[in-house]
């Protein structure tokens, strides 16, 4: 079976058409990644490398485990994800889902205002 003519024409347009929207999206993701990295590394107990081409940060959150956070204590990043979602209403994927206990995956594929609000909620929760 072959690729349909419509799909071929659409693919050609996608790679040969105006790519300014792609450049704008890339700039937005770079800006959000830098912002999220800065906000995460300002939280005591969190260390994070700058994202390199991804749409998420993958910080080490081991410094938050075993601590009183919002009156509760998480012993792993899965428990921490539940605690943060329950109390701060911020969602992240625990590192255990990627074979990396003690880490967390925070997506920055969202608007700037929502990103800042979420990181501020997380920081407020951790700082008590």
Go through each PLM region and give its residues.
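PLP-dependent class I/II
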Residues: 1-128
């Amino acid at each position: 079976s072959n690729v349909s003519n419509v799909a071929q024409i659409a693919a050609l347009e996608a790679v040969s058409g105006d790519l300014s929207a792609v450049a704008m999206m890339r700039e937005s993701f770079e800006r959000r990644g830098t912002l999220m990295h800065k906000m995460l590394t300002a939280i005591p107990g969190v260390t994070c490398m700058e994202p390199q081409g991804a749409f998420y940060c993958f910080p080490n959150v081991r410094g938050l485990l075993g601590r009183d956070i919002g009156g509760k204590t998480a012993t792993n990043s899965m428990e921490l994800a539940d605690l943060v979602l329950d109390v701060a209403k911020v969602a992240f994927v625990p590192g255990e889902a990627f074979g990396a206990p003690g880490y967390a995956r925070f997506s920055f594929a969202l608007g700037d205002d929502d990103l800042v609000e979420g990181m501020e909620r997380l920081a407020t929760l951790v700082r008590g």
